[in-house]
Protein backbone atom coordinates (compact mmCIF):
# COMPACT_ATOMS: atom_id res chain seq x y z
CA UNK A 1 0.00 0.00 0.00
CA UNK A 2 1.17 3.57 -0.66
CA UNK A 3 1.63 6.25 1.99
CA UNK A 4 -0.97 5.73 4.74
CA UNK A 5 -2.21 9.31 4.94
CA UNK A 6 -1.32 12.82 3.79
CA UNK A 7 -2.78 16.31 3.96
CA UNK A 8 -4.72 17.71 1.05
CA UNK A 9 -2.83 20.40 -0.85
CA UNK A 10 -3.75 24.08 -0.91
CA UNK A 11 -5.67 23.95 -4.19
CA UNK A 12 -7.78 21.02 -2.97
CA UNK A 13 -8.82 23.07 0.07
CA UNK A 14 -10.68 25.44 -2.25
CA UNK A 15 -12.86 22.61 -3.56
CA UNK A 16 -13.49 21.32 -0.05
CA UNK A 17 -14.57 24.77 1.13
CA UNK A 18 -16.96 25.29 -1.80
CA UNK A 19 -18.41 21.77 -2.05
CA UNK A 20 -22.23 21.85 -1.86
CA UNK A 21 -25.08 19.76 -3.20
CA UNK A 22 -25.74 22.48 -5.76
CA UNK A 23 -22.10 22.35 -6.86
CA UNK A 24 -20.60 19.04 -5.65
CA UNK A 25 -17.22 19.75 -7.28
CA UNK A 26 -17.30 16.55 -9.31
CA UNK A 27 -16.04 16.32 -12.88
CA UNK A 28 -16.64 13.64 -15.50
CA UNK A 29 -14.49 12.25 -18.30
CA UNK A 30 -15.88 9.60 -20.64
CA UNK A 31 -14.63 7.30 -23.37
CA UNK A 32 -16.98 5.81 -25.97
CA UNK A 33 -15.83 2.56 -27.55
CA UNK A 34 -17.05 0.77 -30.66
CA UNK A 35 -18.70 -2.10 -28.80
CA UNK A 36 -20.90 -2.65 -25.77
CA UNK A 37 -19.18 -2.60 -22.38
CA UNK A 38 -18.70 -5.95 -20.63
CA UNK A 39 -19.22 -5.16 -16.89
CA UNK A 40 -17.26 -8.18 -15.64
CA UNK A 41 -14.22 -7.32 -17.75
CA UNK A 42 -14.49 -3.65 -16.78
CA UNK A 43 -14.44 -4.64 -13.10
CA UNK A 44 -11.39 -6.81 -13.76
CA UNK A 45 -9.73 -3.85 -15.49
CA UNK A 46 -10.45 -1.69 -12.43
CA UNK A 47 -8.84 -4.29 -10.16
CA UNK A 48 -5.74 -4.17 -12.37
CA UNK A 49 -5.70 -0.37 -12.64
CA UNK A 50 -6.21 0.53 -8.98
CA UNK A 51 -2.72 -0.60 -7.80
CA UNK A 52 -1.16 1.37 -10.66
CA UNK A 53 -2.65 4.57 -9.21
CA UNK A 54 -2.36 4.24 -5.39
CA UNK A 55 -2.73 7.99 -4.90
CA UNK A 56 -6.38 7.70 -6.01
CA UNK A 57 -7.19 4.73 -3.76
CA UNK A 58 -7.96 6.91 -0.75
CA UNK A 59 -10.80 8.11 1.41
CA UNK A 60 -11.18 11.71 2.55
CA UNK A 61 -11.51 12.69 6.20
CA UNK A 62 -11.81 15.83 8.33
CA UNK A 63 -9.11 16.06 10.98
CA UNK A 64 -8.86 18.38 13.96
CA UNK A 65 -7.19 21.13 11.92
CA UNK A 66 -7.26 20.00 8.30
CA UNK A 67 -8.67 17.47 5.85
CA UNK A 68 -6.51 14.52 4.91
CA UNK A 69 -6.50 11.53 2.55
CA UNK A 70 -6.14 8.03 3.96
CA UNK A 71 -5.07 5.03 1.89
CA UNK A 72 -7.64 2.24 1.63
CA UNK A 73 -7.77 -1.35 0.42
CA UNK A 74 -11.20 -0.77 -1.11
CA UNK A 75 -11.35 -1.80 -4.75
CA UNK A 76 -13.41 0.19 -7.23
CA UNK A 77 -16.34 -1.51 -8.93
CA UNK A 78 -18.27 -0.31 -11.95
CA UNK A 79 -22.03 0.19 -12.02
CA UNK A 80 -24.58 0.90 -14.73
CA UNK A 81 -25.15 4.62 -15.09
CA UNK A 82 -28.21 5.30 -12.94
CA UNK A 83 -27.56 8.79 -11.53
CA UNK A 84 -27.41 12.24 -13.02
CA UNK A 85 -23.93 13.16 -14.28
CA UNK A 86 -21.55 14.44 -11.61
CA UNK A 87 -23.66 13.32 -8.65
CA UNK A 88 -22.06 14.16 -5.26
CA UNK A 89 -19.14 12.01 -4.14
CA UNK A 90 -18.07 13.67 -0.88
CA UNK A 91 -21.23 13.64 1.23
CA UNK A 92 -22.06 12.15 4.66
CA UNK A 93 -23.86 9.12 3.21
CA UNK A 94 -20.68 8.20 1.29
CA UNK A 95 -18.33 8.51 4.26
CA UNK A 96 -15.24 6.25 4.10
CA UNK A 97 -15.75 5.43 0.44
CA UNK A 98 -13.60 6.11 -2.60
CA UNK A 99 -14.11 9.61 -3.97
CA UNK A 100 -14.39 8.58 -7.58
CA UNK A 101 -16.83 6.32 -9.43
CA UNK A 102 -16.80 4.38 -12.68
CA UNK A 103 -20.06 3.77 -14.54
CA UNK A 104 -20.98 2.51 -17.98
CA UNK A 105 -23.80 3.00 -20.44
CA UNK A 106 -23.93 1.12 -23.72
CA UNK A 107 -20.45 1.48 -25.20
CA UNK A 108 -19.39 4.35 -22.91
CA UNK A 109 -17.17 4.26 -19.82
CA UNK A 110 -17.60 7.20 -17.42
CA UNK A 111 -15.11 8.30 -14.77
CA UNK A 112 -16.29 10.83 -12.19
CA UNK A 113 -13.91 12.23 -9.57
CA UNK A 114 -14.16 14.63 -6.66
CA UNK A 115 -12.09 17.62 -7.71
CA UNK A 116 -10.06 17.73 -4.48
CA UNK A 117 -8.49 14.42 -5.55
CA UNK A 118 -7.06 15.52 -8.90
CA UNK A 119 -7.62 17.80 -11.88
CA UNK A 120 -8.88 17.02 -15.36
CA UNK A 121 -5.46 15.98 -16.63
CA UNK A 122 -4.92 13.53 -13.77
CA UNK A 123 -8.40 12.12 -14.32
CA UNK A 124 -7.75 11.81 -18.05
CA UNK A 125 -4.58 9.78 -17.46
CA UNK A 126 -6.44 7.56 -14.97
CA UNK A 127 -9.25 6.92 -17.46
CA UNK A 128 -6.70 6.12 -20.18
CA UNK A 129 -5.24 3.45 -17.89
CA UNK A 130 -8.68 1.99 -17.20
CA UNK A 131 -9.56 1.88 -20.89
CA UNK A 132 -6.17 0.45 -21.85
CA UNK A 133 -6.46 -2.36 -19.29
CA UNK A 134 -10.07 -3.05 -20.29
CA UNK A 135 -9.18 -3.33 -23.97
CA UNK A 136 -6.24 -5.58 -23.05
CA UNK A 137 -8.79 -8.01 -21.59
CA UNK A 138 -11.22 -7.71 -24.50
CA UNK A 139 -8.61 -7.73 -27.29
CA UNK A 140 -5.39 -9.12 -25.77
CA UNK A 141 -3.59 -9.75 -29.07
CA UNK A 142 -4.09 -6.21 -30.36
CA UNK A 143 -3.17 -4.57 -27.03
CA UNK A 144 -0.10 -6.55 -25.96
CA UNK A 145 2.35 -3.86 -27.14
CA UNK A 146 0.35 -0.87 -25.85
CA UNK A 147 2.02 0.49 -22.68
CA UNK A 148 0.15 1.79 -19.66
CA UNK A 149 -0.14 5.62 -19.58
CA UNK A 150 1.27 5.68 -16.04
CA UNK A 151 5.04 5.22 -16.21
CA UNK A 152 6.02 7.21 -13.09
CA UNK A 153 6.82 5.68 -9.72
CA UNK A 154 4.34 5.85 -6.86
CA UNK A 155 6.69 8.18 -4.96
CA UNK A 156 6.90 10.57 -7.92
CA UNK A 157 3.13 10.56 -8.31
CA UNK A 158 2.53 11.35 -4.64
CA UNK A 159 5.10 14.12 -4.11
CA UNK A 160 3.67 17.57 -3.45
CA UNK A 161 5.20 19.59 -6.27
CA UNK A 162 3.92 22.85 -4.80
CA UNK A 163 6.44 22.43 -1.98
CA UNK A 164 9.22 21.75 -4.49
CA UNK A 165 8.63 24.64 -6.88
CA UNK A 166 6.68 27.33 -5.06
CA UNK A 167 8.64 30.23 -3.60
CA UNK A 168 6.62 32.64 -1.48
CA UNK A 169 7.14 36.28 -2.44
CA UNK A 170 5.42 39.38 -1.14
CA UNK A 171 3.55 41.66 -3.49
CA UNK A 172 5.05 45.11 -3.79
CA UNK A 173 2.30 47.65 -3.33
CA UNK A 174 -1.43 47.10 -3.38
CA UNK A 175 -3.16 45.10 -6.07
CA UNK A 176 -4.99 47.32 -8.56
CA UNK A 177 -8.72 47.66 -7.93
CA UNK A 178 -10.67 46.01 -10.73
CA UNK A 179 -14.15 47.06 -11.88
CA UNK A 180 -17.04 44.79 -10.99
CA UNK A 181 -17.50 42.07 -13.60
CA UNK A 182 -20.82 41.28 -15.24
CA UNK A 183 -22.91 38.65 -13.42
CA UNK A 184 -25.09 36.28 -15.41
CA UNK A 185 -28.77 36.31 -14.54
CA UNK A 186 -31.43 33.69 -14.97
CA UNK A 187 -33.81 31.34 -13.24
CA UNK A 188 -32.15 29.23 -10.57
CA UNK A 189 -32.63 25.49 -10.49
CA UNK A 190 -33.75 23.78 -7.27
CA UNK A 191 -30.92 23.60 -4.75
CA UNK A 192 -29.82 20.01 -5.39
CA UNK A 193 -30.27 19.91 -9.18
CA UNK A 194 -27.76 20.42 -11.96
CA UNK A 195 -28.46 21.00 -15.62
CA UNK A 196 -26.19 19.72 -18.38
CA UNK A 197 -25.90 20.50 -22.05
CA UNK A 198 -24.13 18.08 -24.35
CA UNK A 199 -22.38 19.19 -27.50
CA UNK A 200 -20.22 17.38 -30.02
CA UNK A 201 -17.31 19.05 -31.79
CA UNK A 202 -14.56 17.80 -34.05
CA UNK A 203 -11.31 18.23 -32.12
CA UNK A 204 -9.40 18.41 -35.38
CA UNK A 205 -11.58 21.20 -36.75
CA UNK A 206 -11.65 23.22 -33.51
CA UNK A 207 -7.87 22.95 -33.13
CA UNK A 208 -7.40 24.01 -36.74
CA UNK A 209 -9.55 27.09 -36.15
CA UNK A 210 -7.68 27.97 -32.94
CA UNK A 211 -4.31 27.64 -34.67
CA UNK A 212 -5.61 29.70 -37.58
CA UNK A 213 -6.25 32.50 -35.09
CA UNK A 214 -2.89 31.96 -33.40
CA UNK A 215 -4.27 30.91 -30.01
CA UNK A 216 -4.46 27.76 -27.90
CA UNK A 217 -7.55 25.56 -27.75
CA UNK A 218 -8.24 26.72 -24.18
CA UNK A 219 -8.01 30.40 -25.20
CA UNK A 220 -10.27 29.83 -28.19
CA UNK A 221 -12.96 28.07 -26.15
CA UNK A 222 -12.67 30.68 -23.38
CA UNK A 223 -13.11 33.51 -25.87
CA UNK A 224 -16.10 31.72 -27.41
CA UNK A 225 -17.71 31.51 -23.98
CA UNK A 226 -17.10 35.22 -23.40
CA UNK A 227 -18.71 36.06 -26.75
CA UNK A 228 -21.74 33.93 -25.84
CA UNK A 229 -22.05 35.79 -22.53
CA UNK A 230 -21.70 39.13 -24.29
CA UNK A 231 -24.53 38.22 -26.67
CA UNK A 232 -26.85 37.72 -23.67
CA UNK A 233 -25.88 40.93 -21.84
CA UNK A 234 -28.45 43.74 -21.64
CA UNK A 235 -27.35 46.75 -23.68
CA UNK A 236 -27.05 48.95 -20.58
CA UNK A 237 -24.55 46.56 -18.97
CA UNK A 238 -22.26 45.96 -21.93
CA UNK A 239 -19.72 48.39 -20.54
CA UNK A 240 -18.98 45.93 -17.70
CA UNK A 241 -16.05 43.54 -18.17
CA UNK A 242 -16.65 39.83 -18.65
CA UNK A 243 -14.42 37.69 -16.41
CA UNK A 244 -14.02 33.93 -16.67
CA UNK A 245 -11.70 31.59 -14.79
CA UNK A 246 -9.44 29.28 -16.80
CA UNK A 247 -7.36 26.46 -15.27
CA UNK A 248 -3.65 26.27 -16.05
CA UNK A 249 -1.94 22.88 -16.32
CA UNK A 250 1.42 23.50 -14.64
CA UNK A 251 2.71 20.11 -15.83
CA UNK A 252 3.41 21.88 -19.11
CA UNK A 253 5.84 24.20 -17.32
CA UNK A 254 7.43 22.08 -14.58
CA UNK A 255 9.03 18.60 -14.74
CA UNK A 256 6.58 16.84 -12.45
CA UNK A 257 4.65 13.57 -12.39
CA UNK A 258 2.35 14.83 -9.64
CA UNK A 259 -1.23 13.74 -10.35
CA UNK A 260 -3.05 15.68 -7.68
CA UNK A 261 -4.05 19.28 -8.32
CA UNK A 262 -1.73 21.53 -10.33
CA UNK A 263 -4.23 23.99 -11.72
CA UNK A 264 -4.10 27.59 -10.61
CA UNK A 265 -6.54 29.71 -12.54
CA UNK A 266 -6.26 32.91 -14.52
CA UNK A 267 -8.95 35.49 -15.12
Question: Residue spans of the language-model regions?
Answer:
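Flexible, P/S/T/G-rich "lid" or insertion loops adjacent to the active sites of thioester-utilizing
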Residues: 162-215
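Extended hydrophobic secondary-structure segments that form protein cores and membrane-embedded regions
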Residues: 242-249
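Conserved helix-loop functional segments at active or binding sites
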Residues: 252
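Single conserved hydrophobic/aromatic residue that forms the stacking wall/gate
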Residues: 260-267
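Non-catalytic N-terminal regions of enzymes
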Residues: 1-158, 207-211, 216-240, 256
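Secreted, luminal/periplasmic, and some membrane-associated catalytic domains
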Residues: 240-242, 261
